[in-house]
């Protein structure tokens, strides 16, 4: 490990972003989840898991579950990428339309923000890269953007009614339904990231410029393995933030029976997921129903922790909780089937997971508050539907969640 003079992370990323498969996983909020930032490029190899598993483009197996595929490859190094929500199609007898993609990196830069230090691990010409980064000028650009398509209020409210019908029929207790914006923009993924970093800083900021680019600011941990501990951070319960009224809004949010019921249901689901891979008696709720403030919304958050059973890999642990109950509903499998039926389109990466695996620590955020860019910017937001949901209210919840992400593309 080599120590370097501190340079702004976005300047360092800008200095390497013309290389292959560059990424930045950045902490942009002062919390326990906001200590480290990772930057790298030029992976040793890439892994794509769709209907088959490919390494550097070559088919190596017929495995279509990304967690099973990564277990089989026996990865050495830092594995960074995303598991597309579409991987859930494996659970309902369909083929994923969007592949899950990872790069395996043997060298990387890492920031420790508590110590305000920058290190490199096995990066060739690291000093030269850092010196080049010091000279980089980073400028935010608002750009020109146009909404090509947006999930209409009328359509979404009809979806909510269909979801409620399934709840009344006893199919599910809760279902999370989403809607999508498609935006034409002249902004680059990096420019969108700079804007999002300003408008919606979160514990999990990410920019992955792979075959498609992912630009995101997720508040929510899908799963984290640290040593032998497995941690899930369910977030459910949302209110729009208004300056000067945060305490009042938080109290109202915590006293809302619908929001409380939804949150408790998803904490129970998280406990069940953690129990699948953790020692009996080790699972506990370490934080329960705390209101956390974000730039545009307030969320109710909890944390579930357990100790992994012997022989459970990091990939096994993440598979146990994928996809997160907070983006599907409960019971999870039936909710997934109904989402496929009611939404009727491809979620892509949205509601999947983004992050990294390493030997000692692995950390995946839920792929929300994000832009998926493949020539057009695709932005989704969802709301949890329960028996007493009001369609109009659920529509505006999606609007509140998506507002700051739209600002990142100049809207």
UniProtKB/Swiss-Prot annotation:
<feature type="binding site">
    <location>
        <position position="369"/>
    </location>
    <ligand>
        <name>chorismate</name>
    </ligand>
</feature>
<feature type="binding site">
    <location>
        <begin position="382"/>
        <end position="384"/>
    </location>
    <ligand>
        <name>chorismate</name>
    </ligand>
</feature>
<dbReference type="InterPro" id="IPR006805">
    <property type="entry name" value="Anth_synth_I_N"/>
</dbReference>
<dbReference type="GO" id="GO:0046872">
    <property type="term" value="F:metal ion binding"/>
</dbReference>
<keyword id="KW-0822">Tryptophan biosynthesis</keyword>
<keyword id="KW-0456">Lyase</keyword>
<protein>
    <recommendedName>
        <fullName>Anthranilate synthase component 1</fullName>
        <ecNumber>4.1.3.27</ecNumber>
    </recommendedName>
</protein>
<dbReference type="Pfam" id="PF00425">
    <property type="entry name" value="Chorismate_bind"/>
</dbReference>
<comment type="subunit">
    <text>Heterotetramer consisting of two non-identical subunits: a beta subunit (TrpG) and a large alpha subunit (TrpE).</text>
</comment>
<dbReference type="InterPro" id="IPR005801">
    <property type="entry name" value="ADC_synthase"/>
</dbReference>
<keyword id="KW-0460">Magnesium</keyword>
<keyword id="KW-0479">Metal-binding</keyword>
<comment type="function">
    <text>Part of a heterotetrameric complex that catalyzes the two-step biosynthesis of anthranilate, an intermediate in the biosynthesis of L-tryptophan. In the first step, the glutamine-binding beta subunit (TrpG) of anthranilate synthase (AS) provides the glutamine amidotransferase activity which generates ammonia as a substrate that, along with chorismate, is used in the second step, catalyzed by the large alpha subunit of AS (TrpE) to produce anthranilate. In the absence of TrpG, TrpE can synthesize anthranilate directly from chorismate and high concentrations of ammonia.</text>
</comment>
<comment type="similarity">
    <text>Belongs to the anthranilate synthase component I family.</text>
</comment>
<dbReference type="InterPro" id="IPR010116">
    <property type="entry name" value="Anthranilate_synth_I_arc_typ"/>
</dbReference>
<keyword id="KW-0028">Amino-acid biosynthesis</keyword>
<dbReference type="InterPro" id="IPR015890">
    <property type="entry name" value="Chorismate_C"/>
</dbReference>
<dbReference type="GO" id="GO:0000162">
    <property type="term" value="P:L-tryptophan biosynthetic process"/>
</dbReference>
<dbReference type="GO" id="GO:0004049">
    <property type="term" value="F:anthranilate synthase activity"/>
</dbReference>
<dbReference type="Pfam" id="PF04715">
    <property type="entry name" value="Anth_synt_I_N"/>
</dbReference>
<feature type="binding site">
    <location>
        <position position="397"/>
    </location>
    <ligand>
        <name>Mg(2+)</name>
    </ligand>
</feature>
<feature type="binding site">
    <location>
        <position position="27"/>
    </location>
    <ligand>
        <name>L-tryptophan</name>
    </ligand>
</feature>
<feature type="binding site">
    <location>
        <position position="262"/>
    </location>
    <ligand>
        <name>Mg(2+)</name>
    </ligand>
</feature>
<feature type="binding site">
    <location>
        <position position="350"/>
    </location>
    <ligand>
        <name>chorismate</name>
    </ligand>
</feature>
<comment type="pathway">
    <text>Amino-acid biosynthesis; L-tryptophan biosynthesis; L-tryptophan from chorismate: step 1/5.</text>
</comment>
<feature type="binding site">
    <location>
        <position position="384"/>
    </location>
    <ligand>
        <name>chorismate</name>
    </ligand>
</feature>
<feature type="binding site">
    <location>
        <begin position="203"/>
        <end position="205"/>
    </location>
    <ligand>
        <name>L-tryptophan</name>
    </ligand>
</feature>
<dbReference type="InterPro" id="IPR019999">
    <property type="entry name" value="Anth_synth_I-like"/>
</dbReference>
<feature type="binding site">
    <location>
        <begin position="237"/>
        <end position="238"/>
    </location>
    <ligand>
        <name>chorismate</name>
    </ligand>
</feature>
<keyword id="KW-0057">Aromatic amino acid biosynthesis</keyword>
């Amino acid at each position: 490990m080599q120590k370097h003079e501190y340079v702004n992370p976005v300047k360092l990323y800008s200095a390497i972003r013309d290389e292959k498969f560059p990424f930045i996983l950045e902490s942009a909020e002062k919390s326990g989840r906001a200590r480290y930032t990772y930057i790298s490029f030029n992976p040793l190899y890439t892994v794509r898991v769709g209907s088959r598993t490919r390494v550097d483009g070559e088919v190596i197996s017929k495995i279509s579950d990304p967690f099973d595929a990564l277990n089989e490859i026996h990865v050495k190094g830092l594995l960074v990428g995303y598991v597309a929500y579409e991987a859930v199609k494996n659970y309902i007898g369909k083929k994923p339309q969007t592949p899950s993609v990872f790069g395996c990196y043997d060298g990387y830069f890492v920031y420790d923000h508590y110590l305000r230090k920058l290190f490199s691990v096995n990066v060739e010409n690291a000093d030269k890269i850092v010196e080049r980064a010091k000279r980089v000028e980073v400028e935010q650009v608002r750009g020109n953007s146009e909404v090509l398509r947006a999930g209409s209020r009328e359509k979404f409210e009809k979806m909510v009614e269909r979801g409620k019908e399934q709840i009344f029929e006893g199919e599910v207790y809760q279902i999370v339904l989403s809607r999508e914006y498609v935006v034409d923009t002249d902004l680059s993924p990096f420019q969108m990231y700079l804007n999002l970093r300003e408008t919606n800083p979160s514990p999990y900021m990410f920019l992955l410029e792979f075959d498609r680019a992912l630009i995101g600011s997720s508040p929510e941990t899908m799963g984290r393995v640290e040593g032998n501990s497995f941690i899930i951070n369910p977030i459910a319960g949302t209110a729009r933030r208004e300056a000067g009224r945060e305490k009042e809004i938080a109290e109202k949010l915590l006293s809302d029976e619908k929001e409380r019921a939804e949150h408790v249901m998803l904490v129970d689901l998280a406990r069940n997921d953690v129990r699948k891979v953790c020692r009996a008696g080790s699972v506990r709720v370490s934080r329960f129903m705390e209101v956390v403030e974000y730039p545009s919304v307030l969320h109710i958050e909890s944390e579930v922790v357990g100790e992994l059973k012997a022989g459970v890999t990091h990939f096994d642990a993440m598979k146990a909780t994928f996809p997160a109950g907070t983006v599907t509903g409960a019971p999870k499998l039936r909710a997934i089937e109904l989402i496929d039926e009611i939404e009727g389109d491809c979620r892509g990466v949205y509601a999947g997971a983004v992050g990294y695996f390493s030997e000692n620590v692995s950390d995946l955020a839920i792929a929300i508050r994000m832009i998926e860019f493949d020539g057009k910017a695709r932005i989704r937001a969802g709301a949890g539907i329960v028996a007493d949901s009001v369609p109009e209210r659920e529509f505006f919840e999606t609007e509140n969640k998506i507002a700051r992400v739209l600002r990142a593309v100049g809207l």
